[in-house]
Amino acid sequence: MANDPKVRLRGMYKIFGPRDKEVLHHVKDGMGKEDLLEQYKHVLGLQDINVDMQAGEITVVMGLSGSGKSTLIRHLNRLIEPTAGEILVDGIDVMGLSEQELRNVRQTKMSMVFQKFALLPHRTVQQNAAMALKVRGADEATQNAEARKWLARVGLQGY
């Protein structure tokens, strides 16, 4: 449907530790992160996250250091596996994808800039912005047009 979100997260939990699925019910029953750490030596990363992201919108994930921003983003492309929850991208259940299907979704439906990213110093800003498209095999005209479009969108046109 036209109103369906581009990305939908439902009931997302991430508990770091070897028995994450076993202790999940304690968190769902109200156990806080301090008690979870003290009693089970597990760390609560995400707790019952529910988000819809529409196509064309800019979504900001903001919070203090250690609040779970990077953990949340890494769940979208399954760089981190959730303890529980649902991830839909264009209506596709990302949790049910094979490695090859997941690789295809990562290449065609999303991208990510890591916190400790490394720009290639011998390339221009536009060439760095176009790098993923080059790796994907897009022609040079498409690479340049897309890079210019997105650089303009974030106020970096002309670099």
Residue ranges and their predicted role:
Residues 18, 27-37, 86-104:
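ABC ATPase NBD Q-loop/coupling interface
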Residues 25-35, 90-93, 130, 134-137, ...:
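Conserved ABC ATPase "signature" region
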Residues 83-86, 142:
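Conserved coupling/switch loops of ABC nucleotide-binding domains, chiefly the family-specific signature
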Residues 1-42:
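ABC-family P-loop ATPase nucleotide-binding domain
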Residues 7, 44-46, 105:
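Conserved structural motif at the start of ABC-family nucleotide-binding domains
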Residues 36-41, 95-111, 135, 140:
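ABC ATPase NBD coupling module
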Residues 77:
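Helix-to-loop junction immediately C-terminal to a conserved catalytic motif
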Residues 123-131:
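Short coil-to-helix segment of the ABC ATPase nucleotide-binding domain corresponding to the Q-loop/switch region
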